[in-house]
């Protein structure tokens, strides 16, 4: 089964992120949840983003790369919200990842390298009415998602009919158990 590095969102390594990791692990996988904030968590996304800006996104990226180096056995990298950035970066610049899972966020295919790694599966989960996704992530992901007309595109994009950014985190008001169950099932299918 897969070894996965899962990066948390802007609120930090919340109990809800840990719970999601346990749900993913229930498929027989090992999920590592590095703490990019050194134990700090935040009540609102705005507070968490302010902390991330204080640390600097380059520093968050470096911490993510160090976490990947600590878990060299991992073959899958994943991120939620802000955590998509270090996951995406690792998938593009560290050889050996067979999959990248992006939840509540997406980046340009060439964000950290000229081309997406052809051997790295890309699975994206976004809310269709999520204000954060509507700032560009959803449109960006749709531009390279596989469709009936373009089956050769690199990403599998799953769109959820919700305005909740962190619907997969049970410790937030955004949590939706039904959508989370669908998301986890799709991740298990990818990793099977």
Task: Locate the predicted segments by residue.
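Short beta-strand/loop motif that positions the catalytic acidic residue
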Residues: 118, 124-126, 160
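A conserved short beta-strand
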Residues: 96-107
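Conserved strand-to-loop "acid loop" that flanks and positions the catalytic carboxylate
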Residues: 9, 123-132
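Short beta-strand immediately N-terminal to the catalytic nucleophile in serine-hydrolase-like folds
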Residues: 77-79, 103
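Gly/Ala-rich beta-loop-alpha elbow adjacent to hydrolase catalytic centers
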Residues: 79-87
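Serine-hydrolase catalytic machinery in alpha/beta-hydrolase-like enzymes
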Residues: 1-72, 167-171
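Conserved alpha/beta-hydrolase "acid-adjacent" motif
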Residues: 131-140
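C-terminal catalytic histidine-bearing segment of alpha/beta-hydrolase fold enzymes
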Residues: 151-192
């Amino acid at each position: 089964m897969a070894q996965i590095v899962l990066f948390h969102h802007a609120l930090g390594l919340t109990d809800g992120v840990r719970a999601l990791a346990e749900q993913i692990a229930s498929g027989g996988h090992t999920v590592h949840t590095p703490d990019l904030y050194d134990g700090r968590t935040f009540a609102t996304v705005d507070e968490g983003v302010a902390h991330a800006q204080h640390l600097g996104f380059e520093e968050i990226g470096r911490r993510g790369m160090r976490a990947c180096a600590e878990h060299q056995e991992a073959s899958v990298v994943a991120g939620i919200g802000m955590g998509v950035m270090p996951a995406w970066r690792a998938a593009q610049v560290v050889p050996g990842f067979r999959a990248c899972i992006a939840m509540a966020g997406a980046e340009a295919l060439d964000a950290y390298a000229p081309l997406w790694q052809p051997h790295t599966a890309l699975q994206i989960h976004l809310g269709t009415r999520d204000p954060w996704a509507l700032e560009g992530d959803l449109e960006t992901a749709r531009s390279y998602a596989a469709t009936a007309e373009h089956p050769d595109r690199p990403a599998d994009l799953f769109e959820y009919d919700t305005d909740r950014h962190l619907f997969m985190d049970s410790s937030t008001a955004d949590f939706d158990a039904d959508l989370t169950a669908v998301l986890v099932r799709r991740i298990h299918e990818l990793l099977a």
